């Protein structure tokens, strides 16, 4: 069902994809935290989320142990996520695609050959109210503090 004020099918769930480089640190953390927020607001079934990486190097791997440790510290647990690469059809299937850094955003826009998903692709920091950086730093090559 569409209407003039909200020109999308509101009977279908809103689908959000979080994207980082390898889908083992930032994007799965965003997905885990977001799913918890959705569940707490009782929006299950109305909002769906997933995560993916720009590269498939870690395909099938769980999130980085250091990220899981940091999430656990704040009360979050991994519901069994496994890394997967971004697919071209993700650009059509998701209503919002959230990139963690400029490189992710650039690569997502390159995948969008005809420009139809351009308005769906946004930076994660667009939603940050207390984090003033323009991108979420990749903690992979750093120490444990980078995962906090």
Describe the predicted segments one by one.
Residues 2-7, 13, 96, 102-148:
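Phosphate-binding/catalytic loops
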């Amino acid at each position: 069902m569409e209407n003039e004020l909200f020109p999308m099918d509101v009977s279908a769930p809103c689908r959000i994809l979080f994207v980082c480089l390898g889908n083992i640190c930032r994007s799965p953390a965003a997905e885990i935290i977001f799913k918890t927020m959705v569940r707490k607001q009782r929006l299950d079934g109305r909002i769906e989320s997933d995560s993916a990486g720009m590269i498939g190097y870690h395909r099938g791997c769980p999130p980085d142990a250091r990220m899981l440790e940091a999430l656990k510290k704040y009360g979050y647990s991994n519901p069994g996520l496994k890394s997967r690469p971004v697919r071209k059809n993700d650009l059509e299937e998701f209503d919002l695609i959230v990139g963690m850094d400029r490189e992710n955003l650039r690569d997502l826009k390159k995948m969008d050959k005809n420009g139809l998903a351009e308005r769906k692709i946004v930076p994660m920091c667009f939603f940050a109210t207390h984090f003033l950086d323009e991108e979420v730093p990749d903690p992979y090559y750093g120490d444990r503090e980078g995962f906090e």
